[in-house]
Amino acid sequence: MLQIASLFAGVGGIDLGFEQTGYFETVWANEYDKNAAITYQSNFKNKLIIDDIRNIKVEDVPDFDVLLSGFPCTSFSVAGYRKGFEDEKSGDLFFETLRLIVAKKPQVIFLENVKNLVGHDNGNTFKVIYEALESNGYHIKYQVLNAKDFGNIPQNRERIYIVGFRNIEHYKNFNFPMPQPLTLTIKDMINLSDKLDDRFYYTEDKCSFYSPLQEQMTSDETIYQWRRKYVRENKSNVCPTLTANMGTGGHNVPLVKTKHGIRKLTPRECFNFQGYPEDFILPELAPTHLYKQAGNSVVVPVIRRIAENIYKSML
């Protein structure tokens, strides 16, 4: 078993993808958000340090083989207004990841971030990251993968995955997974038949834009979004990229038409669209926290496929 340390662990999606292979076990994790930590601890038994990573002392972290880091992407994402390293809140958090890498020298590093990381600041941000990893002894491969093409999950979600090896042979052996057919549909992810809690449904008295929704949402085969002035139908029959602000209502929330009415996705359905298994526990938290956690998370089957290839490359 290869041992994992997980930074910015969130609810544990990256950890879960690695553990599902049967080749890796998480020995230590860190997460700052107290609500995400509640979800993490409902599903994982390993040690979780709930603190700002800047307060973590390297000597307090046990030895491990693989470092996972989904360092916060708000400063690199379109949703986060493209600030990058100047962003005091999260731009410097890559360097906190680097601090642990330099101190602990794991065999493998796995980083996940938004696709925009590559183009941010004319490629300079990514260049800094790439060169920092390389100059500290890692051979790097990276690729942007879409969940619908590489995870058999009907969500349009592109993310960059960066894998680094200290061993040049392992690096040469490693390839990202090949595309695979999408066999799961939106209907596999959502519950169209049951009447759910009233709070998920849009009604005339609760929703100022109810009548255009009613007029334009004609199919139960797809997902819609309210885009400030009009209803957008997703023609590709996959869910649009889930975001951390889904639970706040209004703009961009994925909506479905069911026989019981028009409603937004439930937190569980959002986790389904991230490829979490049915037995993944969602604790009794306010839905806004769970929506945020799902939107900030990763597509677990994509992670699992990359993790399998990492393990095979080290044999």
From Swiss-Prot:
Residues 2-315 form the SAM-dependent MTase C5-type domain. GO terms for molecular function: DNA (cytosine-5-)-methyltransferase activity; DNA binding. It is an enzyme of class 2 (transferase). GO terms for biological process: DNA restriction-modification system; methylation. A methylase that recognizes the double-stranded sequence 5'-GCNGC-3', methylates C-? on both strands, and protects the DNA from cleavage by the Bsp6I endonuclease. It catalyses: a 2'-deoxycytidine in DNA + S-adenosyl-L-methionine = a 5-methyl-2'-deoxycytidine in DNA + S-adenosyl-L-homocysteine + H(+). It comes from Bacillus sp. (strain RFL6). It comes from the Bacteria. The keyword Electron transport does not apply. Keywords: DNA-binding, Methyltransferase, Plasmid, Restriction system, S-adenosyl-L-methionine, Transferase. The active site is at C73. Its EC number is 2.1.1.37. Pfam families: DNA_methylase. NCBIfam families: dcm. This is Type II methyltransferase M.Bsp6I. Coiled coil: none annotated. InterPro entries: C5-MTase, C5_DNA_meth_AS, C5_MeTfrase, C5_meth_CS, SAM-dependent_MTases_sf.
